[in-house]
């Protein structure tokens, strides 16, 4: 069992990583006998894990209610969020309740925002079931729902009480979802850790076949990097923005194409290449490193071009609504070398459009 701490003073919390955690009541810290829980999951995961998690919590004396939501990015909305509030109020659940998010990034983000909002804030626990959520979205306290005009535009910074990563969940993960998660894994190597990027080049095949030791190391390293960044810059005033490499372009793809048609990791992968191309055009990133990135993404089965249905101009309205925009000016996360990156303002629309055009599908 691996345990990493996200250090935030009184709001510090553990990330527990191991196989078989759903069999151990102690995994679900800080829950204890007599606590009340609302378990939030989706219709795909409920048949796989709901009874198992409910059972282990009830054996520990926890009182468990549940709400099952539809599955998909398109349901990360205010309308579906209201379903959670209604379930909480009908029981009713008070301020001493704990929400447990059993699912991927959609469930985690939506449940976290529900916890931040319900009765002005209740405790919640992240139980991520996808690779993407295990390495990224469950850690750090970003919670949100989407708006038709932009992804994650309505939300709050609100930290979980703990994160429970059961590696066994990856055994039921569809191949496309596994691949999507690898985009966020590769991102960490590009922005923060050249040695990890090199390790990924040598161990990608092991990750694709769900090799246990390789996957455990991969998730642990990503969580270590994320925990360090969040501890240093919880509210994304500087360093944490680096974690958004590829996301300004990627969120534009998700919004323009319709949430769920491109998975988040797929859109981010294409966005990473666009960011690399933009950095190349500014003379601060080598074409050789861009090719290393493209080669690794392609080996993972990820797209390295944007959707053919989108023109370069289609990206700009979405990108100008990005949360990093200041005074109407685009700010992009750009790689400087493998393992090193920066947030740069003042990137011209000409450079951005040219970088997108470099990555358009024929």
From Swiss-Prot:
Give the location in the cell: Cytoplasm
Domain of life of the organism encoding this protein: Bacteria
Q: What class of enzyme is it?
A: lyase
Annotated positions binding Zn(2+): 184, 247, 264
Q: Which UniProt keywords apply?
A: Amino-acid biosynthesis, Aromatic amino acid biosynthesis, Cobalt, Cytoplasm, Lyase, Metal-binding, NAD, Nucleotide-binding, Zinc
Q: Where are the transmembrane segments?
A: none
User: What is the UniProt remark on how the cofactor binds and its stoichiometry?
Assistant: Binds 1 divalent metal cation per subunit. Can use either Co(2+) or Zn(2+).
Reactions it catalyzes? 7-phospho-2-dehydro-3-deoxy-D-arabino-heptonate = 3-dehydroquinate + phosphate
Pathway field: Metabolic intermediate biosynthesis; chorismate biosynthesis; chorismate from D-erythrose 4-phosphate and phosphoenolpyruvate: step 2/7
One Gene Ontology cellular component: cytoplasm
Sequence similarity: Belongs to the sugar phosphate cyclases superfamily. Dehydroquinate synthase family.
Function of this protein? Catalyzes the conversion of 3-deoxy-D-arabino-heptulosonate 7-phosphate (DAHP) to dehydroquinate (DHQ).
Descriptive protein name: 3-dehydroquinate synthase
> In which organism is this protein found?
Salmonella typhimurium (strain LT2 / SGSC1412 / ATCC 700720)
User: Gene of origin?
Assistant: aroB
